[in-house]
């Protein structure tokens, strides 16, 4: 599994996060069968000819709970809006402004603070860090005014919950849960910045169904 300090090596081949698990769900926490009404995300990395892809998508099991579907739609909508804002020469902050406007101001949900996207390519994680929220103070996000540059490869990944912007963990274990136990979703796309604007290398994810297991 993937190794990132200070965490132990990730014990699974994919992150499987169910309901209030925002990210980094592991195989040993998802042993119970998924049931109607559950929401779960799959986050995987792929290595091909020395290059890495990193993407995540969220699904609902069988049921069509209105709040769950609204949360999922907000996740997809803010991802799409954020990608459109990733124009060469513009600051990374433009991404966060677009995402926050859709997810929080318009949809009324909460974005997780302190987690976000990242550069990638030959390695899974690299600079810059890409926050999903506008920083509250100058020291919260040092890369906020770093510009998007032609040739940049970035993985952007809004994480939303129904009720909180914070997460909790159990010791040094990988899974991160919404601190209030509320439902969460996670979407991640790989984007190449071109002279003409952002190119979503994972555009096909938007064609996936929201509800599975019916």
Predicted regions and their residues:
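Active-site neighborhoods and metal-handling regions in enzymes and metal-associated proteins
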Residues: 1-214
């Amino acid at each position: 599994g993937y190794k990132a300090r200070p965490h132990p090596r990730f014990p699974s081949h994919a992150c499987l996060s169910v309901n209030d698990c925002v990210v980094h769900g592991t195989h040993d926490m998802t042993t119970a069968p998924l049931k109607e009404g559950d929401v779960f995300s799959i986050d995987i990395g792929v290595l091909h000819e020395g290059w890495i892809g990193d993407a995540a998508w969220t699904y609902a099991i069988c049921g069509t709970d209105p709040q769950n579907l609204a949360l999922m739609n907000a996740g997809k909508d803010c991802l799409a809006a954020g990608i459109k804002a990733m124009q060469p020469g513009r600051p990374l902050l433009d991404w966060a402004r677009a995402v926050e406007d859709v997810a929080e101001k318009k949809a009324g949900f909460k974005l997780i603070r302190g987690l976000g996207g990242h550069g990638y390519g030959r390695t899974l994680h690299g600079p810059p860090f890409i926050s999903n929220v506008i920083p509250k103070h100058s020291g919260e996000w040092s890369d906020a005014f770093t510009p998007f540059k032609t040739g940049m490869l970035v993985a952007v990944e809004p994480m939303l919950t129904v009720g909180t912007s914070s997460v909790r963990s159990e010791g040094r274990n990988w899974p991160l849960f919404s601190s209030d136990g509320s439902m969460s979703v996670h979407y991640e796309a790989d984007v190449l910045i071109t002279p003409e604007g952002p190119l979503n290398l994972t555009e096909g994810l938007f064609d996936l169904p929201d509800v599975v297991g019916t």
